[in-house]
Amino acid sequence: MKEKMKEKLTVIKVGGKIVEEEATLNQLLNDFAAIEGHKVLVHGGGRSATKIAAQLGIDSKMVNGRRITDAETLKVVTMVYGGLVNKNIVAGLQARGVNALGLTGADMNVIRSMKRPVKEVDYGFVGDVERVDSTLLSDLIHKGVVPVMAPLTHDGQGNMLNTNADTIAGETAKALSAIFDVTLVYCFEKKGVLRDENDDESVIPQINHAEFQRYIAEGVIQGGMIPKLENSFEAINAGVSEVVITLASAIHTDGGTRIKK
């Protein structure tokens, strides 16, 4: 008996300036609305959180580019990610005829996490994803709903947890790959993974894991791109069909960097 072909699903992750500046957000929403078939949008919003925290007199503490989420900061990121940024995106998509539904991990228990254990650094109320309810998401998607997921999860004990948006996108794509033929696209402000960070045209068109390790050793790939690529390889190895890292405005092109096993 021939195996039934899976329906296609696109998971798009956006963050940074893209979701926080009106012009780039509007362009993104136009491009996202034009994606055919099933889709999910995962967003960040760290710069907005830093800005609002400063206005409230709360210092933002960072270690190795990662936010320390103390009790006061958790209130801010819950307001900003789950409220301001998420609902702006949902409203913008509804205006474009996309039946978007804003979700945090706590909503309908869609993503449960465990508070990150203290090792060298205490990151505070930060969650490491334990499970994604792919059945719930699939049911919503098959009803024509487009989930818009904020970078917040919960621990099942009444506590919200700040959670990396790249990780949420990767874990969501992995969970849904059992049901759909999933393409995961990480959008950011560069055209892809660059050989030379000062040359926007030096895009590496595709990269496998051995090349990734070599580029790290050579210092070509460093900083925040390392965890982004680690998430990408985990997704590919877990059954996601395709992972692309690209410019937000290029999601309808063949540009960017494609991740291979």
UniProtKB/Swiss-Prot annotation:
- A GO CC term? cytoplasm
The family this protein is said to belong to: Belongs to the acetylglutamate kinase family. ArgB subfamily.
Function comment: Catalyzes the ATP-dependent phosphorylation of N-acetyl-L-glutamate.
The GO terms describing molecular function are: acetylglutamate kinase activity; ATP binding
Q: Name the Enzyme Commission number(s) assigned to this protein.
A: 2.7.2.8
| Family annotation (PANTHER family) | N-ACETYLGLUTAMATE SYNTHASE, N-ACETYLGLUTAMATE SYNTHASE, MITOCHONDRIAL
Ligand binding (substrate): 45-46, 67, 162
Organism annotation:
Bacteroides fragilis (strain ATCC 25285 / DSM 2151 / CCUG 4856 / JCM 11019 / LMG 10263 / NCTC 9343 / Onslow / VPI 2553 / EN-2)
The protein in question is named: Acetylglutamate kinase
Give one Pfam family.
Answer: AA_kinase
Which residue positions hold the site described Transition state stabilizer?
Answer: 13, 228
Q: Which reaction does it catalyse?
A: N-acetyl-L-glutamate + ATP = N-acetyl-L-glutamyl 5-phosphate + ADP
Keyword list, A-Z: Amino-acid biosynthesis, Arginine biosynthesis, ATP-binding, Cytoplasm, Kinase, Nucleotide-binding, Transferase
What CDD domains does the database record attribute to this sequence?
AAK_NAGK-like (cd04238)
